[in-house]
Amino acid sequence: MIGRLRGVVIEKQPPEVLLEVGGVGYEVQMPMSCFYDLPEIGKEATIHTHFVVREDAQLLYGFNHKQERALFRELIKTNGVGPKLALAILSGMTATQFVLSVEREEISSLVKLPGVGKKTAERLVVEMKDRLKGWVSHDLFSPAEITLPARESALRAPDSSEEAASALVALGYKPQQASQIVSKVAADGMSVEDIIREALRSLV
Protein backbone atom coordinates (compact mmCIF):
# COMPACT_ATOMS: atom_id res chain seq x y z
CA MET A 1 0.00 0.00 0.00
CA ILE A 2 1.22 3.52 -0.80
CA GLY A 3 0.89 5.59 2.37
CA ARG A 4 2.95 8.67 1.61
CA LEU A 5 4.55 10.37 -1.38
CA ARG A 6 7.27 12.99 -1.39
CA GLY A 7 8.20 14.53 -4.69
CA VAL A 8 7.97 17.46 -7.08
CA VAL A 9 4.66 18.95 -8.18
CA ILE A 10 4.63 18.58 -11.97
CA GLU A 11 1.06 19.50 -12.82
CA LYS A 12 -1.97 20.83 -10.97
CA GLN A 13 -5.42 20.32 -12.45
CA PRO A 14 -8.00 20.51 -9.65
CA PRO A 15 -8.81 18.25 -7.95
CA GLU A 16 -5.84 16.24 -9.26
CA VAL A 17 -2.12 16.80 -8.81
CA LEU A 18 0.70 15.03 -10.66
CA LEU A 19 3.60 14.33 -8.30
CA GLU A 20 6.93 13.05 -9.62
CA VAL A 21 8.68 10.68 -7.21
CA GLY A 22 11.91 9.02 -8.31
CA GLY A 23 11.15 9.60 -11.98
CA VAL A 24 7.62 8.20 -11.70
CA GLY A 25 4.57 10.45 -11.99
CA TYR A 26 1.72 9.72 -9.57
CA GLU A 27 -1.76 11.09 -10.24
CA VAL A 28 -3.31 11.96 -6.89
CA GLN A 29 -6.84 13.24 -6.30
CA MET A 30 -7.13 15.65 -3.40
CA PRO A 31 -9.99 17.41 -1.61
CA MET A 32 -9.94 21.08 -2.56
CA SER A 33 -9.48 21.99 1.12
CA CYS A 34 -6.08 20.25 0.83
CA PHE A 35 -5.36 21.21 -2.78
CA TYR A 36 -5.31 24.93 -1.90
CA ASP A 37 -2.24 24.39 0.29
CA LEU A 38 -0.13 22.66 -2.35
CA PRO A 39 3.11 24.43 -3.30
CA GLU A 40 3.60 25.85 -6.77
CA ILE A 41 4.58 23.70 -9.74
CA GLY A 42 8.25 22.74 -9.52
CA LYS A 43 8.26 22.75 -5.71
CA GLU A 44 8.48 19.70 -3.46
CA ALA A 45 5.44 18.40 -1.60
CA THR A 46 4.70 15.60 0.84
CA ILE A 47 1.27 13.99 0.56
CA HIS A 48 -0.30 11.36 2.82
CA THR A 49 -2.19 8.94 0.60
CA HIS A 50 -5.00 6.42 0.62
CA PHE A 51 -4.76 3.75 -2.08
CA VAL A 52 -7.95 2.33 -3.64
CA VAL A 53 -7.95 -0.70 -5.93
CA ARG A 54 -10.96 -1.31 -8.17
CA GLU A 55 -11.55 -3.74 -10.99
CA ASP A 56 -11.12 -0.97 -13.56
CA ALA A 57 -8.66 1.36 -11.83
CA GLN A 58 -6.11 1.98 -9.09
CA LEU A 59 -6.63 5.37 -7.46
CA LEU A 60 -4.64 7.51 -5.06
CA TYR A 61 -6.29 10.06 -2.78
CA GLY A 62 -4.00 12.57 -1.11
CA PHE A 63 -4.04 14.76 2.00
CA ASN A 64 -1.74 17.30 3.63
CA HIS A 65 -2.12 15.80 7.10
CA LYS A 66 -2.58 12.29 8.45
CA GLN A 67 -5.66 13.49 10.35
CA GLU A 68 -7.38 14.51 7.11
CA ARG A 69 -6.67 11.07 5.70
CA ALA A 70 -8.02 9.49 8.89
CA LEU A 71 -11.25 11.45 8.47
CA PHE A 72 -11.49 10.36 4.82
CA ARG A 73 -11.16 6.75 5.96
CA GLU A 74 -13.89 7.25 8.56
CA LEU A 75 -16.12 8.75 5.87
CA ILE A 76 -15.80 5.78 3.52
CA LYS A 77 -16.74 3.44 6.36
CA THR A 78 -20.14 5.12 6.38
CA ASN A 79 -22.89 3.27 4.55
CA GLY A 80 -23.40 4.73 1.07
CA VAL A 81 -20.25 6.88 1.09
CA GLY A 82 -17.50 5.95 -1.37
CA PRO A 83 -14.16 7.66 -2.07
CA LYS A 84 -15.63 10.02 -4.68
CA LEU A 85 -18.33 11.31 -2.34
CA ALA A 86 -15.87 11.56 0.54
CA LEU A 87 -13.59 13.65 -1.70
CA ALA A 88 -16.49 15.95 -2.58
CA ILE A 89 -17.48 16.34 1.07
CA LEU A 90 -13.97 17.36 2.11
CA SER A 91 -13.81 19.75 -0.84
CA GLY A 92 -16.96 21.58 0.22
CA MET A 93 -15.79 21.79 3.84
CA THR A 94 -12.48 21.63 5.65
CA ALA A 95 -11.96 18.64 7.91
CA THR A 96 -12.63 20.79 10.98
CA GLN A 97 -15.83 22.24 9.55
CA PHE A 98 -17.14 18.79 8.68
CA VAL A 99 -16.41 17.36 12.13
CA LEU A 100 -18.14 20.32 13.78
CA SER A 101 -21.17 19.95 11.48
CA VAL A 102 -21.50 16.29 12.45
CA GLU A 103 -21.01 16.98 16.17
CA ARG A 104 -23.66 19.73 16.07
CA GLU A 105 -25.98 17.66 13.85
CA GLU A 106 -26.14 20.45 11.26
CA ILE A 107 -28.10 18.58 8.60
CA SER A 108 -28.87 21.84 6.77
CA SER A 109 -25.14 22.43 6.19
CA LEU A 110 -24.38 18.87 5.13
CA VAL A 111 -27.13 18.69 2.49
CA LYS A 112 -25.52 21.59 0.61
CA LEU A 113 -22.56 19.35 -0.24
CA PRO A 114 -22.61 17.65 -3.68
CA GLY A 115 -24.17 14.20 -3.61
CA VAL A 116 -25.41 14.58 -0.04
CA GLY A 117 -29.18 14.42 0.34
CA LYS A 118 -31.12 14.52 3.58
CA LYS A 119 -30.90 10.76 4.16
CA THR A 120 -27.16 10.70 3.55
CA ALA A 121 -26.65 13.71 5.83
CA GLU A 122 -28.65 12.04 8.59
CA ARG A 123 -26.66 8.83 8.11
CA LEU A 124 -23.38 10.74 8.40
CA VAL A 125 -24.49 12.20 11.71
CA VAL A 126 -25.87 8.94 13.12
CA GLU A 127 -22.92 6.78 12.08
CA MET A 128 -20.07 9.24 12.61
CA LYS A 129 -20.99 11.41 15.59
CA ASP A 130 -19.67 9.01 18.23
CA ARG A 131 -16.63 8.09 16.15
CA LEU A 132 -15.63 11.74 15.72
CA LYS A 133 -16.24 12.79 19.31
CA GLY A 134 -13.37 14.92 20.57
CA TRP A 135 -11.51 15.12 17.25
CA VAL A 136 -11.50 18.94 17.14
CA SER A 137 -11.08 19.58 20.87
CA HIS A 138 -8.02 17.34 20.96
CA ASP A 139 -6.30 19.44 18.28
CA LEU A 140 -6.20 16.61 15.76
CA PHE A 141 -6.39 19.22 13.03
CA SER A 142 -4.08 22.17 12.56
CA PRO A 143 -5.43 25.71 13.19
CA ALA A 144 -4.89 26.52 9.49
CA GLU A 145 -7.68 24.12 8.58
CA ILE A 146 -10.39 26.03 10.41
CA THR A 147 -10.51 28.70 7.72
CA LEU A 148 -9.47 28.43 4.13
CA PRO A 149 -6.10 30.13 3.66
CA ALA A 150 -5.71 33.15 1.45
CA ARG A 151 -3.59 32.64 -1.63
CA GLU A 152 -1.88 35.07 -3.93
CA SER A 153 -3.95 35.46 -7.06
CA ALA A 154 -2.40 34.98 -10.45
CA LEU A 155 -3.82 36.75 -13.50
CA ARG A 156 -6.82 34.75 -14.58
CA ALA A 157 -6.23 32.93 -17.87
CA PRO A 158 -9.05 32.83 -20.43
CA ASP A 159 -9.77 29.18 -19.66
CA SER A 160 -9.63 29.52 -15.86
CA SER A 161 -13.40 29.55 -15.59
CA GLU A 162 -13.69 26.45 -17.76
CA GLU A 163 -11.09 24.61 -15.67
CA ALA A 164 -12.83 25.63 -12.45
CA ALA A 165 -16.20 24.43 -13.75
CA SER A 166 -14.64 21.11 -14.80
CA ALA A 167 -13.20 20.68 -11.31
CA LEU A 168 -16.61 21.26 -9.74
CA VAL A 169 -18.16 18.69 -12.07
CA ALA A 170 -15.44 16.22 -11.06
CA LEU A 171 -16.45 16.82 -7.45
CA GLY A 172 -20.05 15.90 -8.18
CA TYR A 173 -21.81 19.13 -9.11
CA LYS A 174 -24.02 19.18 -12.19
CA PRO A 175 -22.45 20.86 -15.27
CA GLN A 176 -25.10 23.57 -15.51
CA GLN A 177 -24.86 24.36 -11.80
CA ALA A 178 -21.06 24.46 -11.99
CA SER A 179 -21.05 26.82 -14.98
CA GLN A 180 -23.60 29.15 -13.42
CA ILE A 181 -21.80 29.50 -10.11
CA VAL A 182 -18.40 29.95 -11.78
CA SER A 183 -19.81 32.71 -13.98
CA LYS A 184 -21.18 34.38 -10.88
CA VAL A 185 -17.97 34.39 -8.81
CA ALA A 186 -15.19 34.59 -11.44
CA ALA A 187 -13.42 37.90 -11.88
CA ASP A 188 -10.18 39.20 -13.38
CA GLY A 189 -7.17 38.52 -11.19
CA MET A 190 -8.54 35.19 -9.94
CA SER A 191 -6.68 31.93 -10.48
CA VAL A 192 -8.45 28.61 -11.04
CA GLU A 193 -8.03 27.78 -7.35
CA ASP A 194 -9.46 31.17 -6.32
CA ILE A 195 -12.53 30.62 -8.48
CA ILE A 196 -13.10 27.12 -7.10
CA ARG A 197 -12.70 28.35 -3.52
CA GLU A 198 -15.26 31.12 -3.98
CA ALA A 199 -17.63 28.81 -5.85
CA LEU A 200 -17.54 26.22 -3.05
CA ARG A 201 -18.04 28.91 -0.43
CA SER A 202 -21.13 30.22 -2.19
CA LEU A 203 -22.53 26.72 -2.72
CA VAL A 204 -22.10 25.71 0.92
Curated annotation (Swiss-Prot):
It comes from Aeromonas hydrophila subsp. hydrophila (strain ATCC 7966 / DSM 30187 / BCRC 13018 / CCUG 14551 / JCM 1027 / KCTC 2358 / NCIMB 9240 / NCTC 8049). Homotetramer. Forms an RuvA(8)-RuvB(12)-Holliday junction (HJ) complex. HJ DNA is sandwiched between 2 RuvA tetramers; dsDNA enters through RuvA and exits via RuvB. An RuvB hexamer assembles on each DNA strand where it exits the tetramer. Each RuvB hexamer is contacted by two RuvA subunits (via domain III) on 2 adjacent RuvB subunits; this complex drives branch migration. In the full resolvosome a probable DNA-RuvA(4)-RuvB(12)-RuvC(2) complex forms which resolves the HJ. The gene is ruvA. Keywords: Cytoplasm, DNA damage, DNA recombination, DNA repair, DNA-binding. InterPro entries: DNA_helicase_Holl-junc_RuvA_I, Hlx-hairpin-Hlx_DNA-bd_motif, NA-bd_OB-fold, RuvA, RuvA_2-like, RuvA_C, RuvA_C_sf. Residues 1-64 are annotated as: Domain I. Pfam families: HHH_5 (PF14520), RuvA_C (PF07499), RuvA_N (PF01330). GO terms for biological process: DNA recombination; DNA repair. Residues 144-155 are annotated as: Flexible linker. GO terms for molecular function: ATP binding; four-way junction DNA binding; four-way junction helicase activity. Belongs to the RuvA family. GO terms for cellular component: cytoplasm; Holliday junction helicase complex; Holliday junction resolvase complex. The RuvA-RuvB-RuvC complex processes Holliday junction (HJ) DNA during genetic recombination and DNA repair, while the RuvA-RuvB complex plays an important role in the rescue of blocked DNA replication forks via replication fork reversal (RFR). RuvA specifically binds to HJ cruciform DNA, conferring on it an open structure. The RuvB hexamer acts as an ATP-dependent pump, pulling dsDNA into and through the RuvAB complex. HJ branch migration allows RuvC to scan DNA until it finds its consensus sequence, where it cleaves and resolves the cruciform DNA. Has three domains with a flexible linker between the domains II and III and assumes an 'L' shape. Domain III is highly mobile and contacts RuvB. This is Holliday junction branch migration complex subunit RuvA.
